[in-house]
């Protein structure tokens, strides 16, 4: 998150013009400030890191509900038998983890020439930032499930 924050700060502090026309210096300078690869890569890394966090969170949820792993009642219900307890939350956690894992697949390496071949590289930064936002949203939901399950386990 810190690396992504720094990349955003760097991007906001730079001018994306190429070439940069500096009237006060009577100069025209070529620049690479139009290239947002650093920003794209830091958000890709954040998404991948969150996918690892999601996998461990989902695994903890499953283990807390398994008597073999936790010495707690199955699905955290004292009633046993046909009582589902928190079993349905496993399905939601598994679905969220799968969505996060899918969204974390790198997008930035999949680019095509744009602007009729004038611009040969587009790092897909807006799409990467958006998918990282979607990952973070799902991660908050998964964390909420883990907290509820952990609270029930303590209870």
Label every PLM stretch briefly.
Residues 1-55:
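Accessory "access/gating" subregions that flank catalytic or transport cores
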Residues 37-155:
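C-terminal catalytic subdomain
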């Amino acid at each position: 998150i810190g690396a992504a924050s720094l990349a955003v700060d760097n991007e906001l502090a730079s001018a994306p013009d190429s070439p940069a026309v500096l009237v006060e210096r009577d100069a025209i300078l070529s620049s690479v400030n139009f290239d947002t690869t650093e920003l794209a890569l830091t958000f890709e890394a954040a998404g991948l890191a969150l996918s690892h966090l999601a996998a461990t969170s989902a695994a903890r949820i499953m283990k807390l509900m398994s008597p073999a792993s936790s010495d707690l009642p199955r699905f955290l219900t004292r009633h046993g038998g046909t009582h589902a307890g928190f079993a349905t939350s496993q399905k939601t956690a598994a679905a969220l983890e799968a969505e996060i894992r899918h969204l974390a697949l790198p997008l930035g390496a999949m680019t095509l020439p744009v602007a009729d071949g004038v611009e040969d590289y587009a790092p897909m930064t807006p799409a990467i930032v958006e998918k990282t936002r979607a990952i973070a949203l799902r991660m908050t939901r998964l964390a909420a499930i883990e907290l509820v399950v952990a609270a029930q386990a303590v209870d």
